[in-house]
Amino acid sequence: MNHIQNAMNQAAELIRKAYDTAVAEGLLPEAEVRPVQIEIPKDLRNGDYASGFAMQNAKVLRQNPRKVAEILVEKMDLTGTCFASAEIAGPGFLNLRLSHSWFENVLTNITEEGENYGRTAAEKPEKIMVEFVSANPTGPMHMGNARGGVLGDCLAEVLHRAGNEVTREFYVNDAGNQIDKFASSLDARYRQIILGEDAVEFPENGYHGNDIKVLAQKFFEKNGDSYLNRPEKERHEALAAFGLENNIPAMKADLQRYLINYDVWFFESELHNSDYVADTVKKLTENGHTYEKDGALWLNTSYLLEQMYRAEGKSSEDIEKLELKDDVLRRANGFYTYFAADIAYHRNKFEVRGFDRVINIWCADHHGHVARLKCALDALGLDGTNRLEIVLMQLVQLVRAGQPVRMSKRTGNAIALHDLLDEVSVDAARFFFNSRHSASPIEFDLGLAVRNDSENPVYYVQYAHARNKSILKALAQDNIPTDVKTADLSLLVESAELDLIRDLSRLPEEIRLAAVQRDPSRLNRYATQVATAFHKFYTECRIKDAAPALREARILLSCCTAAVIENALSCFGVSAPDHM
């Protein structure tokens, strides 16, 4: 149950009904008033919920705003609602205070729903695909993949808990230029093993990582020099296939270690082998959006983008400054470009597999590709403008002792995901990478991530849970029942208790907002706030030494807190240990 939304809806309905009653009784004139807006005040001493309705509509009601507020408060009927009182503040703010029964209902609801607390039913559930990481299978995954993995996985989880049908997908780029470059790099290293490094020139734009040397050595150990004198095309195909056979399982293993499990691994080669790329380009041509030039087939991207920008209200002058260009779909040599395959892939998502919405997690340096892909899908009649969302993600900077870290101590290469997980826990990695909005860069402090104190944010939250569990365990060892399902919750009146319950009530709304805003980092901040509220409760409210009825109520509150922290952490794949 979403307690925040329910309370806000009740507050809005109370004010609207009070206005209608005042109009019916001739106390206020009938007018086109603005909709009732409800907010949560920063200072809860002013009330739990507030509205500026009286001030916003004073002009059309031809009354002093405070007078309008007085009339509305007088006509409010709080019977059967979650509110105990309505008050006026300042020039005409309407402040509503929650009744104690609301706080009691929150704890009852958490107790009843348990691990399902926080999940809600979407008003309009969608079939959504979240595609993320999709790293080239030509080498180890880097820090951008590490951040994108957590971002995509957590976003998929909150979308699911908010009531949508969600599919996690990894797109394997096993065709095209990068695979050609992968094959030529492996080929050079393979021949260097046999003929010597000086005898074989390494391609200037090849992959220079040590992993290429390792793969080439494995290929040599398996095949010897049997491929040395075979045709280059045959050798490249064998090397690329061998490399992918080794790299893709390694990528899957790293991601599973990182607690990321995909529903679908989709291979680019399937689009080419089934002629789906060719068919997609054919449809674009039939729709009048391509032309031939210099032996290549082009998409009239500049025209499509211009139409899209005009629809958004951009002026001709602004559009001209963008220097829009067209894109090649099929090269003069007959091969299709990556862009053509990408259009076909997204057409498959919508047209073949029937997703209502597709969300891609991309690094911010791909921003120039967003509008081009959307307008290409529009040209296919798939409404890419509205149905395709791209979440752009900023870079990650690893630091240790305040200094940037770029190389692995073990391998001497750029730090890969598996290197990171050798140094810090999966919990720490997932927490840190989900700690900020995707549009903000992340500074990942390796030293901080391994500290076992409250300075480490993941430790701080997990310790609150472990501390809570240890309290309950100690009580049970003293023969005090801790499996409490009901208690006299009216006894919970201390500010630390009520503040904690307020925070516990927010989980369903935080999950909803994380889904709507495409920002799962909200859950990190929320879990930290609950941990802080629990530490305050533990400091100010004794449990063991309290009177039996109050002790029972506080035990139930502690159990609810444990459930909420565990549920919140599970949204972004972090464990909630019972002891630390």
Residue spans of the language-model regions?
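Short, charged, solvent-exposed linker or helix-capping segments at domain edges/interfaces
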Residues: 105-110
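Non-catalytic interaction-recognition regions
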Residues: 2-104, 115-580
